[in-house]
Amino acid sequence: MDVKFPPYLTIRTARSLVNKCEEALGSRQRDVNFDLSISVFSDPFAVTLLAGAIKACVKKGHRVQFVKPNVKKLDEWFDSIGFYAFGGADPGSAKYSERQVELRRFSNLDPTYTEQVLGVLCNDIRMSERVRDSLRMSVNEMLTNAFDHSQSPE
């Protein structure tokens, strides 16, 4: 089943995105193709929404595939944040910059992910090791709370 997404994947198009995600989740076919071919722009909100839909589709037993955006810049951005790998396509293809962190499923606290987040936060800001340690503890606490309060079995 092909689910064709709109040109703009943003919080302003949330209703359309939610409808498309529900369409994918409701599919009775094993293969669900997220067709992003006409998409030209995405914001982090849309990526989070799509990632949640992908995870739910995989959990329901769907095989998720992508029709990648025709816009090269958007395609490269999705690849660079691990979006395709998150959905099971192109594993290991992500190429992260110092301003990005990988889109990832959590089952517990991961110190390497905390270091990636700190790398992004500290990329343009000089801070003492003491402040960095405090920030590390805050990020760990935030990730722990998010997982503990998500009521998710995974």
Per-region residue spans from a language model:
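Amphipathic alpha-helical interaction surfaces in cytosolic regulatory modules
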Residues: 6-87
